[in-house]
């Protein structure tokens, strides 16, 4: 349970960094509002690359009975939340990259080294 809480907190911190640092709007709907993963309900889980950039590991999830989806075309790792849960902390993994389409992370033929991090590791990096 504590591990899930730590992963959720990490996801929120990284998503905030990604959303606030984005130069473009992440939402293509007609409302004109920016899509912010951390304010729309439940945070999406992320894995980090070598530079500490967090990328979602799934393009949709259940949030208190409602299905939430990452916007079309956003980058993702195809490992899913279960894959992230099986990863060992701070060990490098070869993760397949993709783009979100209809709530599914569709592989794009590329891969990247990714890591599962902890809240403590994130705080050290931010200090």
Curated annotation (Swiss-Prot):
Family matches, as InterPro entries: EVA_Class_A
Keywords for the protein's UniProt record, in alphabetical order: Disulfide bond, Glycoprotein, Secreted, Signal
Extent of the signal sequence: 1-21
Protein name: Evasin P467
Gene3D superfamilies: 2.30.130.100
Any one GO molecular-function label of the UniProt entry: C-C chemokine binding
Cellular-component GO terms for this entry: extracellular region
Disulfide links within the chain: 42-63, 59-100, 76-105, 95-114
Species lineage: Eukaryota, Metazoa, Ecdysozoa, Arthropoda, Chelicerata
Chain positions carrying an annotated carbohydrate: 49, 94
Function description: Salivary chemokine-binding protein which binds to host chemokines CCL1, CCL2, CCL3 and CCL5.
Localization, UniProt: Secreted
